[in-house]
Design a protein with these regions (language model features):
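Short, solvent-exposed loop/turn segments at secondary-structure junctions
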Residues: 57-59, 113-114, 194-196, 236-239, ...
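Active-site-proximal specificity loops/subdomain of glycosyltransferases
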Residues: 134-191, 196-210
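Short, well-formed alpha-helical segments that are part of the catalytic scaffolds
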Residues: 102-130, 134, 138-146
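A structural signal for short, well-ordered beta-strand segments and their strand-loop junctions
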Residues: 132, 187-191, 229-234, 289-293, ...
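Short, aromatic/basic amphipathic alpha-helical patches
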Residues: 63-69, 119-124, 141-151, 246, ...
């Protein structure tokens, strides 16, 4: 008789590194997550974990046949019955008759990726108007790509007044920031150009959302506070659907998809890891950076999409590795620069076959969310007209 495994009291999804910075302010999330979409995300552990050892390769293959799953020497763990990783492919959070438009303009900074335009195609599919900042030598290619991918209706190309400067994407991001101020915006979104999809986390499911509403929810939540200067969604691959998470985490870094207040005094700088750097400077002022778990981004893996930083920075510093398609040394300078800029909280570590930075966010646990004056919130749930379409026809997939 197999009994359900007992839960270790010390186990918590909040203990893992991706949510470092979890503090009392996050433990009180239910006091803040009001007049927001319904959010239920509880731990849903396996019934039982069984560790198995096989005496021979033949025994291993016989076992694979008996359970009807493919097992190789690289297989570390499996679910039984077999986990259906495609079960949510045709599920989408869509709008029921009304779409909430964005309050703040959205920018993509892109270089040398007119042949993919991953983020722009995703936003256009969701019918979200946005800007793409490109360098002069790329303008013609990007303009042609708007017709190739049939996204011209939703895209405005902005030609940056510089090219091939080699000092990182910060210059283009600052230029987009200035552009947003020039059109009267009080905040702006700035996105990497390799974000394929965006997701809502609810009821232990990561399901794509298919309109601007998910971004609007994040905007509305952030706009309640006087001291949240940077916010954005968590990476999908850092959220395990069967673990417990709060809908947001305060006092941590935001990557790749950032909502930034235009009155933030800190601008982009540095050639590498500029996302973490700007967030650390904001938090060192006693202000808050807020990362959403309730809404997530699906990012292509670092250095796997040609163009952009992959060509200009990581591989350029170790050209021999370009022949192999991936440069394991490409992130060492990126990590070291952050450690040099923030030696009080950042160090360089080797993990998962490549160099990473490690940041201690504990010093920022004292940074509390502060409501703006005259904020009056309704109690209860506001689902923003989102409904679950169980048979969404995505042109990228076929049944």
């Amino acid at each position: 008789l197999l009994l359900p495994r007992s839960k270790n009291k010390s186990e918590s999804a909040l203990d893992i590194e991706i949510n470092e910075g979890v503090t009392d302010v996050n433990a009180k999330w239910k006091e803040h997550w009001v007049d927001m979409p319904e959010y239920v995300q509880e731990e849903n552990p396996s019934f039982r974990t069984i560790h198995m050892h096989f005496r021979t390769e033949q025994h291993y293959q016989d076992f694979a046949k008996r359970i009807g799953q493919e097992l190789t020497e690289k297989t570390n763990a499996i679910w039984h019955p077999k986990l259906d990783i495609t079960k949510n492919r045709f599920l989408r959070w869509v709008d029921d008759g009304f779409t909430f438009p964005l309050r703040h303009p959205m920018y993509i900074v892109s270089k040398g990726r007119a042949d993919s335009m991953i983020t722009s195609r995703s936003l256009s599919r969701m019918k979200i108007p946005h800007y793409i900042v490109v360098e002069p030598q790329d303008m013609q290619d990007y303009d042609k790509a708007l017709d190739t991918f049939d996204i011209r209706q939703y895209v405005t190309l902005l030609e940056a007044p510089f090219s091939n400067h080699g000092d990182g994407p910060g210059r283009a991001r600052n230029w987009a920031w200035d552009h947003s101020i020039s059109i009267g915006a009080t905040s702006h979104w700035v996105l990497d150009d390799n974000l394929a999809d965006f997701y809502r986390l609810h009821n232990n499911e990561r399901i794509r959302f298919e309109s601007s509403t998910g971004f609007r929810v994040m905007e509305d939540f952030v706009d309640r506070y006087d001291n949240v200067y940077i916010a954005g969604p968590q990476y999908r691959f850092f959220i395990a659907p069967n673990q417990k998470y709060p809908p947001y985490v305060a006092n941590t870094r935001i990557y790749s998809c950032l909502l930034i207040r235009n009155d933030c005094k800190h601008k982009w700088r540095g050639r590498y890891n500029e996302d973490t750097d700007i967030c650390l400077r904001v938090m060192k002022d006693g202000d808050v950076c807020l990362q959403f778990n309730a809404f997530m981004q699906g990012k292509m893996a670092t250095q796997t999409v040609s163009g952009g930083n992959t060509a200009e920075f990581y591989h350029a510093e170790n050209t021999d590795a370009m022949k192999e398609g991936y440069n394991t040394d490409g992130t060492i300078n990126k990590s070291q620069m952050l450690a040099d800029m923030h030696p009080d909280v950042a160090t360089v570590v080797w993990r998962y076959g490549r160099w990473h930075h490690h940041v201690n966010y504990n010093p920022f646990k004292k940074n509390k969310l502060k409501f703006k004056d005259n904020i009056h919130l309704s109690t209860g749930v506001n689902n923003y007209n989102m409904i679950l379409d169980r048979n969404f026809q995505d042109p990228r997939f076929s049944k």
